[in-house]
Amino acid sequence: TQLSGGQQQRVALARIMAYQPDVILLDEPFSALDGYLKDHMQEELIEMLEDYDGTVIMVSHSRDEIYRFSQRLLIIDRGEITNHGDTKEIFDHPVTKTAAMLTGCKNFSDVKVLDAHTLEATSWGITLHVACELSDEIHYIGYRAHQFEPIWGEREENCIAFRLSSKAELQFERNFYVKPETEAFHRDDILTWLVQRACWQTIEEKGLPDYLKLHERDMLFLK
C-alpha cells in the first residue's frame, strides 16, 4: 500500500521522535502539502514537540510557519547572516531591508536623511517628518501594505498622492497597486495597498481616497 504525502510525513516524524535526538532539522517540512493538510500536519507537529527537550531547527521560506513555530529567527542573505534574535521582535522591527521583505513588507523606497527628523523617500517622491531621531545608517524605508490610512479631502502630513495602476480582488482582501505622483512628475514605482473586506463598503461608497497616509509608528527605517 502506498502512503499519502501526509501519512509519509507522520511516519517520518514518528521515527525521528523515537530516536530522541538532541537536535531535529526540519527542511521545508510542509512545502509539498496542500493548505488543508498542511494545517493539520502543523498541529500534529506542535503536539509531538510539546514534550521534546532538544533543539529544533526549521528551514522555511514561509513567514507564517516561522512566526508560528520559532522562538528565535536567523535570516541568511547570499550566505551572510543579516538578522538573528527573537522572532516576534524581528517581525516587528526587521532593521534590514532583507528581513523586512522576508517578513512580508511589500513597499520600499530609497531615502535621503535630510536632518534628524526629516527624510526624503526618493522612490515615492515625498518628504516625511517624524518625531524620532533618524540615524545616518538608514538607507531605506519600508511600509506594510495593510497599514496605509486612506485620506479623503485635505492633505495631511506624511501623505502620498497616487493614481491607480491596477487592482486584484481576493477572497478576503483587495490589493490596490498604485503609482505615487507629485506635482512635477509621475513615479514608476508601484505601491501595494491592501484593504480588508470590512473596509470595502467605505471605498465603494466614497471612491478611492485622495491620499494614503503613512503613520510614523508603522514606518520601518532600514539599513
Question: What positions do the PLM features span?
Answer:
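Non-catalytic connector elements of ABC transporters
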Residues: 106, 117-223
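ABC ATPase nucleotide-binding domains
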Residues: 1-98
